[in-house]
Amino acid sequence: MSHSVKIYDTCIGCTQCVRACPTDVLEMIPWDGCKAKQIASAPRTEDCVGCKRCESACPTDFLSVRVYLSHETTRSMGLAY
């Protein structure tokens, strides 16, 4: 079951989330929007197991990376039965 992984532009390019991910869902890509000149990207969301280690590792006050579990996404969209 894949989950939705959202990277926000508050990312500071620290790579903590990438290193914390046990399934290599995240990677860093070039980006001029922060001092580190890179941002996290989630090209392999189908491999996300929903452990949320990336969220726990994020040092920003507003989590720059969020994992939305499939049942959370369904509930938030009002599609739950």
Curated annotation (Swiss-Prot):
Cofactor note: Binds 2 [4Fe-4S] clusters. Cluster 2 is most probably the spectroscopically characterized electron acceptor FA and cluster 1 is most probably FB.
GO molecular function: 4 iron, 4 sulfur cluster binding; electron transfer activity; metal ion binding; oxidoreductase activity
Chief localization: plastid
PROSITE patterns: 4FE4S_FER_1 (PS00198), 4FE4S_FER_2 (PS51379)
Annotated positions binding [4Fe-4S] cluster 2: C21, C48, C51, C54
Catalytic activity, EC: 1.97.1.12
Function: Apoprotein for the two 4Fe-4S centers FA and FB of photosystem I (PSI); essential for photochemical activity. FB is the terminal electron acceptor of PSI, donating electrons to ferredoxin. The C-terminus interacts with PsaA/B/D and helps assemble the protein into the PSI complex. Required for binding of PsaD and PsaE to PSI. PSI is a plastocyanin-ferredoxin oxidoreductase, converting photonic excitation into a charge separation, which transfers an electron from the donor P700 chlorophyll pair to the spectroscopically characterized acceptors A0, A1, FX, FA and FB in turn.
Protein name according to UniProt: Photosystem I iron-sulfur center
